[in-house]
Design a protein with these regions (language model features):
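Acceptor-binding helix/loop patch of EC 2.4 sugar-transfer enzymes
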Residues: 98-126
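Alpha-helix capping/helix-boundary segments
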Residues: 40-41, 90, 148-150
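A short, glycine/small-residue-rich beta-strand->loop->alpha-helix junction that serves as a flexible
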Residues: 2-16
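Helix-loop-beta element that forms the nucleotide-linked donor phosphate-binding surface
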Residues: 150-168
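Active-site donor-binding segments of glycosyltransferases and PAPS-dependent sulfotransferases
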Residues: 14-20, 24-86
Length: 168
């Protein structure tokens, strides 16, 4: 799931990840990799399929519908059995989900940054935080970039299966 991975370093990671996985040429491979994105992409081979989600589903008002209805529907439709999720919100599913966590707002809810946000940003991030809190238990494993983030996830959300993989 790369649906909302659209700014800063995440955008570069998304581009590199898509280019790498789209070059898979494993003859006899029995697996298909489905990439959920908001960009139109050409399927270069039979092993990688891009599922384009319209930008409207990233809208603050549609986020709950996206994560509770649209994405679970696609999981069932394409018989997806494992998920690697790079977005800020876990997916509502019982399928094995590895969640790559890199959204500091969720582990610093007391930060002064929240008080300095404009109304739209605060509503948008508060909505995402609400979804994160309510969907975190759908994850089987969370990958964090530092021990501090791992410890905060464990403390704030009582989610214990967090592994640290340092990036950069």
């Amino acid at each position: 799931n790369l649906l909302t991975y659209n700014s800063g370093g995440a955008k570069v990671f998304k581009k590199n990840y898509i280019e790498s996985i789209n070059n898979i040429e494993n003859v006899g491979c029995e697996k298909t990799f489905y990439i959920l994105t908001n960009e139109t992409r050409k399927n270069n081979n039979e092993y990688v399929k891009f599922l384009k989600i319209p930008h409207i589903f990233e809208n603050i008002f549609f986020l709950p519908f996206t994560y509770f209805v649209v994405i679970p529907f696609l999981i069932r439709k394409y018989k997806i059995n494992k998920i690697v999720n790079f977005c800020d919100i876990p997916i509502f599913t019982k399928i094995y989900q590895i969640f790559y966590f890199d959204w500091p707002y969720a582990v610093y809810p007391e930060s002064v940054v929240w008080k300095k946000m404009g109304a739209y940003d605060k509503i948008y991030r508060s909505s995402k935080l609400f979804l994160f809190k309510n969907l975190i238990n759908n994850c089987n494993l969370i990958i964090a970039q530092s021990q501090v983030i791992s410890d905060r996830l464990k403390k704030l959300y009582d989610f214990q299966n967090v592994k640290v993989i340092k990036m950069g």
